[in-house]
Amino acid sequence: MERTIEKPRIRVSADNRAFLETSRLVSACGLNTVCQEAACPNISECWSSKHVTVMILGSVCTRACRFCNVTTGKPELLDPHEPEKLASAVGKLGLRHVVITSVDRDDLDDGGAEHFASCVRRIRETSPGTSIEVLTPDFLGKVGARDIIIAAAPDVFNHNVETVPRLHPKIRIKARYFNSLSLLEEVKRKDPRIFTKSGLMLGLGEERSEVLQVMDDMRVAGIDFLTIGQYLRPSKKHMEVQRYATDEEFQYYKEAAYARGFLMVASSALTRSSYHADEDFLHLKNARAGALAKLV
């Protein structure tokens, strides 16, 4: 693709009072959120709608991926009370759908998998009507980590491949493209009831043919939901944006993904892994029901 640098105008609407109330509750509950740590462009809109993506396992990551704004360094000790605090916060915020993500914790024997599972179980106990989505790291392929979370039975298991295989070595520190696909494939194989989800960023130097190949690979792995968004450089220390995709390109990829059989596709400049995740979960359930009805 031709290198193009032309940043689109992005406007996000927000209810200021609702945003401030969510901000107050997040602070009062002592939550870390990826919304803040990753400098997400959608924070105003999401928090105005009381949609929060919580970040567990601390706020310091053991990796330094070139696209990510989360702090890198030596992580703090795990908070054993975090599952309880998180469950309480979900209740106070009145969340219909909660997304739980984390920093990478390569220093832990299980990569933090048991902590993830504890959070899922505690929310199930205290807010049984809330659907739960986990957005996990790859756990460095640590034995048993994936199965611990599968056993906790989140509604959605999300793990992002982020970019095309050719760009992985310089974009995703320690991560491997096919390890990420294998993680999601095993989730679907071991519990087909769990929706699987993954995401891509555009603007890192990928070619159209490479993006389409990733879609094909994802479908072979049985992934249900694909998100595609524009990479935005968090700071001058991070990877430069190679180009800004047009609305037409996002629409092209959306149509190409649906043609390949994804149940759900979100594709736009502002799309992020958990953007509109509560609404998308309802669409996912309806799409699966519709697909199953056609088989009867």
Swiss-Prot record:
[4Fe-4S] cluster 2 binds at residues 61, 65, 68. Residues 47-263 form the Radical SAM core domain. Binds 2 [4Fe-4S] clusters per subunit. One cluster is coordinated with 3 cysteines and an exchangeable S-adenosyl-L-methionine. One of its GO terms (cellular component) is cytoplasm. It holds the Pfam family Radical_SAM. This is Lipoyl synthase. Signal peptide: none annotated. Its EC number is 2.8.1.8. Transmembrane segments: none annotated. It is found in: Cytoplasm. It catalyses: [[Fe-S] cluster scaffold protein carrying a second [4Fe-4S](2+) cluster] + N(6)-octanoyl-L-lysyl-[protein] + 2 oxidized [2Fe-2S]-[ferredoxin] + 2 S-adenosyl-L-methionine + 4 H(+) = [[Fe-S] cluster scaffold protein] + N(6)-[(R)-dihydrolipoyl]-L-lysyl-[protein] + 4 Fe(3+) + 2 hydrogen sulfide + 2 5'-deoxyadenosine + 2 L-methionine + 2 reduced [2Fe-2S]-[ferredoxin]. It is an enzyme of class 2 (transferase). [4Fe-4S] cluster 1 binds at residues 35, 40, 46, 274. Pathway: Protein modification; protein lipoylation via endogenous pathway; protein N(6)-(lipoyl)lysine from octanoyl-[acyl-carrier-protein]: step 2/2. InterPro entries: Aldolase_TIM, Elp3/MiaA/NifB-like_rSAM, Lipoyl_synth, rSAM. Keywords: 4Fe-4S, Cytoplasm, Iron, Iron-sulfur, Metal-binding, S-adenosyl-L-methionine, Transferase. Belongs to the radical SAM superfamily. Lipoyl synthase family. It comes from the Bacteria. CDD domains: Radical_SAM. NCBIfam families: lipA, PRK05481.1, PRK12928.1.
